[in-house]
Amino acid sequence: MKDGFIQQVGTPTEVFDMPLNLFVAEFIGAPKMNTFKTTLTVEDGKYFVNPYGVKIEVNGKKADMLTNKGVQSGEIILGVRPEHFVLSDESNPAAIPCKIVVNEMMGSELHLHVLEDNGDRLIVRIPTVSLTDEQRASLVYGSTIYVTFEGKVMHFFDPETQLNLLV
């Protein structure tokens, strides 16, 4: 509910996986969904997003849905949940460089609050079981990490209406 109006009705899974709008997307889930402005492009029938100067192909069901909805190239708000980011390395062309500003140890996972080069703050959630002791020790304030995400886990919102482009 926002401003006295119900925003979406559905099962918890439906609301989490396919939020109707940006408000619902950021409200459901902890930590909240990361959102940032970027462009969606269509090249040879394939969709790409271009956050922070990297090019990531939209794939899987999300690509099919964009095609079926007839979504065209343009400015969007891209949503990526913290658990959908993965650590990468500098050699990956889809890697986004970020500087760690907060490392929250939550027991079975780390919540890394990072700043992208242009100043956007993102939250990256990493299961501690997936890290070596060396990796864990390197994830400290001020260190640079590289993160990326798969094309099948993205959410796409209209920057004017804030509605999900796939609903």
Segments from the language model and where they lie:
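Internal alpha/beta loop-helix hairpins
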Residues: 1-56
